[in-house]
Regions:
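Beta-propeller fold detector
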Residues: 54-62, 101-109, 143-153, 190-199, ...
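Blade-level signature of beta-propeller repeat domains, shared across WD40, Kelch, NHL, RCC1
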Residues: 305-351
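Conserved beta-strand positions in repeat-built beta-propeller and related beta-rich domains
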Residues: 36-40, 82-86, 126-130, 171-175, ...
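Short loop/turn segments immediately following beta-strands, especially the blade-tip
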Residues: 49-53, 93-100, 136-144, 180-190, ...
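Aromatic- and glycine-enriched pocket-lining scaffold segments that form the walls
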Residues: 126-136, 144-186, 192-194
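Structural signal for beta-propeller blades
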Residues: 42-45, 88-90, 132-134, 177-179, ...
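Beta-rich, blade/repeat-based domains predominating
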Residues: 29, 61-77, 108-123, 151-168, ...
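An edge-strand/N-cap motif at the start of beta-rich repeat modules
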Residues: 26-53
Length: 351
């Protein structure tokens, strides 16, 4: 197993310039770009190829500082959104005509400090510490004015992640709420946030989620569980067994991968119907605590931090869900790298 280590210092990150609907549908797409953000002040979007070579380092023109979140970066049809927690806005980037180079398109103000973003129904959804809001997306960019907002049930700063399912949003608040918000026919947020039913009695820190169609898989991190939410109700809950605090999720066809922070690992589950079955307790291990995970076109990207440095690990995923480590990028002196997405070749062409 070959792993090439690329080391970047915190000071180098600041000066590096440009170098020489459901996301889980199966296709012939190939991975093109792997993205993460420094989450520093100022914040920077880092763009790599699947081999871990730095292609671009782009200022978001905002400030980072988010923690305890999931989905800090989102992508859809060549657009990429990045949360800037410290400056209460979201940077939106657009792929150029070659489908491989990003440029800043919009800086969208948020109602409060943003923690998570998602695309769907021609909208950008921004989850902040107290609310969720929708912004219309067009080829010209993202409307800076929200066309819908809803206050979270707790609105206590514990918001974790937002995801899009059929006709609504699913949201986590770490203060033990899994909630939904309805969308209009055009995709705008409408009405109030509602607590989903049948949440396990031992609920403790809902955090990350992954969505597909009408299903949302949600981690209940400190209860060591993963739940399936459908139609405003929890249908199934599965324990993570030997691995503790599953916090972040990524879907790959029949496989669901969880990043387990204190266990320094990724687990693999088989998911179908209402079933969540642990297939491999430990599919991969890391030097630090994982802080996010993403899948795209046969690649899995995982961010981790060991308290001194952050790392981006890029795995190949075979048809059986087995992970083979390809490259590891080390961010020397950068401890809070946040968010990861993988841009595929078909997304680059969907301009």
């Amino acid at each position: 197993m070959l792993a090439r280590i690329v080391t970047l210092s915190a000071s180098a990150l600041a000066i590096i310039g440009t170098a020489a609907n459901p996301a889980n549908a199966q296709s012939h797409a190939t991975p093109e770009l792997v993205l993460t953000a420094t989450n520093a002040s100022p914040n920077t979007l880092l763009v790599y190829d699947p081999s871990g070579n730095l292609l671009q380092s782009i200022a978001t023109h905002g400030h980072g500082g988010v923690s305890g979140n999931a989905g800090g970066i989102a992508k859809h049809r060549g657009q990429v959104a990045v949360v800037n927690f410290g400056s209460s806005d979201v940077s939106v980037f657009d792929l150029g005509t070659d489908g491989r180079r990003l440029h800043l398109q919009d800086l969208v103000p948020a109602v409060s400090n943003p923690v998570s973003v998602a695309f769907g129904y021609n909208h950008l959804y921004i989850l902040s510490t107290t609310s969720v809001e929708s912004h219309w997306v067009s080829p010209a960019g993202v409307d800076p004015q929200p066309d819908g907002t809803a206050t979270l049930l707790h609105a206590d700063g514990s918001a974790g992640q937002v995801g899009v399912v059929t006709g609504q949003l699913v949201i986590t608040e770490k203060s033990n709420a899994i909630e939904s918000v309805a969308l209009t026919a055009d995709g705008a947020v409408t009405g109030n946030a509602n607590l989903v039913s049948d949440i396990p009695a031992n609920v403790n820190t809902p955090l990350g989620l992954a969505t597909r169609g009408n299903d949302a898989y949600v981690t209940i991190a400190h209860a060591n569980e993963i739940s399936l939410v459908r139609d405003d109700a929890v249908l199934t809950t599965t324990p993570s067994v030997t691995q503790h605090a599953p916090c972040w999720l990524a879907l790959d066809g029949p496989f669901l991968f969880s990043a387990n922070s204190p266990s320094l690992s990724v687990s693999r589950y088989a998911v179908y119907g209402q079933h969540i079955i642990q297939d491999a307790a430990v599919a991969a291990t890391f030097e630090g605590d994982p802080t996010d995970i993403a899948y795209g076109a046969g690649r899995l990207g995982v961010i981790d931090s060991d308290g001194t440095n952050s790392h981006l690990s890029i795995f190949k995923v075979d048809e059986d869900g087995n992970l083979t480590l390809g490259d590891v990028v080390t961010f020397t002196g950068v401890v809070s790298t946040n968010g990861v997405v993988i841009i595929t070749s078909d997304e680059g062409l969907a301009r």
